[in-house]
Amino acid sequence: MNEVPEPSPELLQRAGAVRRAAVDLGMADDGQRMQALQAMADALAERSDALVAANREDLDRSASEGLAPALLARLKLDAAKLEGAIDGVRKVASLKDPLGRRDLHRELDQGLTLERVTVPLGVLGVIFEARPDAVIQIASLAIRSGNGALLKGGSEARCTNEAVMEALKAGLASSAVSPDALALLTTRQESLALLKLDGLVDLIIPRGSNELVRFIQDNTRIPVLGHADGICHLYVDAAADLDKAVRVALDSKTQYPAACNAIETLLVHRSVAASFLSAAIPAFRDAGVVLRGDAASVALGVPESATEADWRTEYLDLTLAVKVVDDLAAAADHIRRFGSRHTECIVTEDAAAADRFLSSIDSAGVYHNCSTRFADGFRYGFGAEVGISTQTLPPRGPVGLEGLVTYRYRLRGDGHVAADYASGASRFTHNDLSL
């Protein structure tokens, strides 16, 4: 990747405008922010034909340039997908206000009261893949949580992104929220210079390749939220219901293989490997999945041999690595060695084994008897997500509204001074009050 350039005067001016708008947005009340989102949704709906046409232009150009089928699938924004995205904006508008929530209320002394309340982060800098519905998701979450946003999408989606941003700003213009709260970056140089906007941007959220995320983490002083890989695993335990295991594994891989929560490695307990693979191999073959396995799984019918590189690969396509393991402990060891702490699943009817798996695997999501494709902010009831974080510190997993706020301590007194408590003239009471 290129070296990070200094921000241009024009970028500094635009970022400053977003910052100023974000201050006002953070003080907007719940109703004003809800109304702003409804106006954004209305503007998108009114311009739906133009948005789909802009996306078709991006699709045609990208197909002629040889963009991979998996990336073309992400790039596509047809009428149905757009309708779903618009519905998502309205759902975010209806979510409970994340701001002004008090989770601590304490009397430190008579007339000296402390509270901790949620407030916006400020300005988000979001760099995302060629997926134009991401612009809609991120913008809606930013406005609902009181944050401004600088957004940079993949160049493959430039026509769609520009048309979507124009619609979103038109919606905001008819609301109490300034259109300046959102800005679209359009060049590679701007996305690189974004990394030097500390003081104007409070959090960077990268969504894209491992290389992109690593580069951003290594080249900015701004906090970064995101994940570098989505190497997800499904483990078929000795006590698995094999029909259930085939169904869950198939969905986890094929429901949307380009997603970061699709499985890339299938681990199978040795005692059920023959019976499970005899059913799973034809099912995956019929779904167009290429299987690559270790020696034990190849001996049981997996058609291609895997190398160690396969255990580290996020295919984002219809390819799946398969490995036979001796037991749950061996499966857990493999996941710890090669996983990215995104999402893992165990299929078993043994409750104790499930509990061991759920408590021993340090991933953002650990599942029992269900598809890894549920690792999604919308499916969790968050309305939408800005991304998935695999970091240990919060927010972790799918990041929705709750992950886009911080908190502020407010202390109200009446001439209280610390010297009185240091001398013993006054004493703290530290009485918790009702929230």
Swiss-Prot record:
Q: Where is the signal peptide?
A: none
Matching Pfam families? Aldedh (PF00171)
Under the heading PROSITE patterns, the entry gives: PROA
Q: Which organism is it from?
A: Synechococcus sp. (strain WH7803)
Q: Which UniProt keywords apply?
A: Amino-acid biosynthesis, Cytoplasm, NADP, Oxidoreductase, Proline biosynthesis
UniProt enzyme class: oxidoreductase
Q: Report the GO terms under cellular component.
A: cytoplasm
Query: What cystine linkages occur within this chain?
Result: none
Q: Name one GO molecular function term.
A: NADP binding
- What's the family? Belongs to the gamma-glutamyl phosphate reductase family.
| Pathway the protein contributes to | Amino-acid biosynthesis; L-proline biosynthesis; L-glutamate 5-semialdehyde from L-glutamate: step 2/2
Query: What NCBIfam families does the annotation carry?
Result: PRK00197.1, proA
What protein name is recorded for this chain?
Gamma-glutamyl phosphate reductase
Principal location = cytoplasm
Q: Which GO terms describe its biological process?
A: L-proline biosynthetic process
State its Enzyme Commission number(s). 1.2.1.41
**Organism superkingdom:** Bacteria
Q: Which InterPro entries match?
A: Ald_DH/histidinol_DH, Ald_DH_C, Ald_DH_N, Aldehyde_DH_dom, G-glutamylP_reductase_CS, Glu-5-SA_DH, GPR_dom
Location relative to the cell: Cytoplasm
Q: What does this protein do?
A: Catalyzes the NADPH-dependent reduction of L-glutamate 5-phosphate into L-glutamate 5-semialdehyde and phosphate. The product spontaneously undergoes cyclization to form 1-pyrroline-5-carboxylate.
Catalysed reactions, semicolon-separated: L-glutamate 5-semialdehyde + phosphate + NADP(+) = L-glutamyl 5-phosphate + NADPH + H(+)
